[in-house]
């Protein structure tokens, strides 16, 4: 929520929300959603998100869309999620653009349309949203939506990986391991696998295990070869 107003106290924010301030209403919704300063209450969160969203606040529109997407505080309804996410996406909210892209990719709440998914992922990725950067990287790596381009895949994986997106760190490690889109470099591969593994990424943990097992086997083979070498 950059470039957003702040209030000195929770009560001042709540009063501003009651008096109709859209940003305060959005913040109050977040407080109810997360249980910050109040008891967690998803229905109250939705109430305040809706009041703010109806005043065209893009952050609240995104939150409301995600509530419909997940069924938190409202019945899950993908078409309603798409409606609010589009409102926010059209105002350049990167989280909304990413989530709208996901709906187009999966065909939930909107007709499945990979070109639209690509469009919204790119909009979001260019605004620095890591999950969108990762998905855009996947599109370029697989070549199913855009022409396959490993260099572009690496570019977007790296952008997301540097923001601690674990799947992107894992995929960037794989690119270094295999030399796809980047010069092969096992040390770099291990570095990114470790960063992803520390966040609990199972694929990275598996790849790291394979790497160390292979390294150990190579070391043992080298020792045995040295033993057999005539002196």
Which role fits each region the language model picked out?
Residues 2-8, 16, 207-231:
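Terminal, low-structured helical/coil segments at or just beyond the last alpha-helical repeat
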Residues 18-21, 34-36, 41, 55-57, ...:
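Short helix-capping/linker turns of helical repeat alpha-solenoids
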Residues 27-34, 63-70, 99-106, 135-142, ...:
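Hydrophobic face of amphipathic alpha-helices that form TPR/SEL1-like repeat modules
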């Amino acid at each position: 929520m950059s470039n957003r107003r702040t209030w000195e106290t929770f009560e001042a924010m709540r009063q501003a929300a009651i008096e109709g301030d859209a940003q305060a209403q959005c913040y109050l919704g977040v407080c109810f959603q997360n249980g910050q300063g109040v008891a967690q209450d998803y229905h109250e969160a939705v109430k305040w998100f809706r009041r703010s969203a109806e005043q065209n606040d893009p952050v609240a529109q995104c939150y409301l869309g995600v509530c419909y997407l997940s069924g938190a505080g409202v019945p899950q309804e993908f078409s309603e999620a798409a409606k609010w996410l589009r409102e926010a996406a059209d105002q350049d909210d990167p989280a909304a653009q990413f989530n709208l892209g996901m709906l187009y990719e999966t065909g939930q709440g909107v007709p499945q349309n990979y070109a639209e998914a690509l469009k919204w992922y790119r909009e979001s990725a260019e605004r620095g949203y890591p999950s969108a950067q990762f998905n855009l990287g996947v599109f370029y790596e697989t070549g199913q939506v855009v022409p396959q381009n490993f260099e572009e895949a690496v570019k977007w994986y790296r952008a997301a990986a540097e923001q601690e997106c674990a799947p992107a760190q894992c995929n960037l490690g794989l690119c270094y391991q295999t030399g796809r889109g980047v010069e092969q470099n096992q040390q770099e591969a291990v570095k990114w696998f470790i960063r992803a593994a520390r966040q609990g990424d199972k694929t990275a943990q598996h790849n790291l295990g394979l790497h160390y097992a292979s390294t150990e086997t190579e070391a043992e083979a080298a020792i045995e070869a040295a033993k057999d070498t005539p002196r």
